[in-house]
Amino acid sequence: MKKEEKIAILQEIIRIKSVNGNEGEVAAYLNKLLEKHGIIGELVSYSNGRDNLIAQFQKGQSGKVLGLSGHMDVVAAGNESSWTYAPFAAEIHGNRLYGRGATDMKSGLAAMVIAMIELKESGKPFNGTVKLLATVGEEVGELGGEQLTKAGYVDDLDALIIGEPTNYSLMYTHMGSINYTVISHGKEAHSSMPDQGYNVINHLNEFITKANAEMNHLAEAIENPVLGKTIHNVTLISGGNQVNSIPSHAQLQGNIRSIPEYPNDKIIALLQSIVKELNQETDYHLELTIDYNKIPVKADPDSPLIHCIQQQFSQPLPLVGAAATTDAAEFTKADHSFDFVVFGPGVVTLPHQIDEYVELDNYLDMIEKYQAIILSYLA
């Protein structure tokens, strides 16, 4: 495939506005492209207009199965007038292709698809199966990753590469993430007679104080050598009706980034114990809800998959971790374990930013590197 066509494919999928939805249009485009080159795909519907894409091909004797995965959704562009170049125009300036999803992660997804096409048409021998898993809803809960895992689509994998941006680093571990809500129920009263009511904001403040103390203690006591410490932040709070009334309803939301050494179930139990303790007070009525629960993940940094990748470079690539989550948080819940790594084009600090871009030489190089990795792993 010519260089210009590889770039044009990336431009086409960036121009599809798959903002927290509409992934079906991306899936249909990629499925048609793959079928044009003899690779048959399957659309797996999540909801109306939202389709995952599974595609695979095999060569030689039935050997190992190597998965390639990327998500098709992107986050909102924000204030589009703040962009130097329109976020869905996919303009090229110098060596940079600009657009929402250029780095996170349509360049990684396109590179994987093109690598499969070129490898199939090259006739180069290998033994095994290459399997694409293009997912919906990664940005808002790894929805497609969860769906495909529960449906058994990763049960045959021996290894998996997720093409999120890592800029020539190998991400083998990342933090988990928990979003929670605490609702405080109380009793309204006039602000001149606070003893006639139950001030729910004071109650939330007490929860924040206790939660911060417990989480700070946890962070100081347990640390992961790569990921660091557990991170806790209360990020949203709302309540009250007017300034001269004691509020009867308020709520807060918080986010926790977890590490393998103190997993999510223990953190959730800790939050529950704080709420239970406070609710022993006669005027307290706190209600805890876990809104989002993604586990931390860790792969073997000395796995055959990582060795195959390292062999494609003259200098060893750094092994890293990240605070952000990926579809690995769902895929690794499969009934069997498999090697995985996050490795794709783009700078890790650019996702969700204004003027997001990918370096074209990085994108084009990853197409070649993915092919070399496949041939090595499935030799």
Q: Model segments located where?
A:
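Midchain, well-structured core segments that form catalytic/ion-binding scaffolds
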Residues: G145-Q280, T289, K294
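An extended, acidic, His-containing surface patch that forms the Zn2+-binding/catalytic region
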Residues: N224, E287-A379
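Generic non-transmembrane alpha-helical segments
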Residues: I9-E12, I16, Y29, L33-H37, ...
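N-terminal helical capping/dimerization or prosegment-like subdomains
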Residues: M1-A77, H249-Q253, L360-N362
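Active-site metal-coordination/substrate-binding segment of hydrolases
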Residues: G63-K131, L360
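Acidic/histidine-rich catalytic neighborhood of metal-dependent amide-processing enzymes
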Residues: M105-M175, N179, A379
